[in-house]
């Protein structure tokens, strides 16, 4: 047991270092490409940091264990647990990171049009994914149509986000790199090749650290006797969402609210469209009580964020309230 906790601590350090390497390179990439913070956060950062939680269900469905039922439980739990974590606990932690400097009545001010686009897309997509749970397994044509609609939503979202980039850059929302690139400190020039190299190093460390953390968490959960579905819904996302949590905390502390929130909401869109599409087609995708409870809380938390998307920003006290959603889910699920 002691070794497991040492492994968890070491992998957490790896993830923290990786997040610094990744965010630093991404800021330089966004600045060099002259793209908005919305594109950098909601697309590039979101997809990059979503790699660990994307791998978990894919590897599970490809045959992570010898039991197909267990593989499907892990797959469904990981797919639905990630957006739950982002909409509740991750948002709460980001707000908590600046409550001392901004106060509970302070605000976090991401660029509003991009934030609203992210939340509207996620709410539409996750609602479709929820509807798919009630479609009988034998009605594969309807399930396939819903899965295709989810993929189409993400494609449309990417197109709209890129289209808005030029206007946002002109309006002062371009990505800026406040610090020198880390690789430049060891004598390498700051150019596109070294930026991409540092990005790849950051992603590799993020994925490796998250996988190691997942391994440690799984070991602890087995010792405690936690089920596969509960493990993938509650415990694994704590590890796989660490890159988003750490990146967003780093950016929010630097005053980069659009990047910080875009990293979360962009990951929610990615994980609320493409991954559920896979789940609909490759798993039972049924409205089991613990699954449906998580989906309802996720939609409620996302709707709460959307309702609070005001011109002057989102109140920190309102974001702290999202943490109650995660606490409520734990209480309801563990009480069963």
Segments predicted by a language model, with ranges:
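Hydrophobic alpha-helical segments, chiefly the membrane-spanning helices
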Residues: 1-336
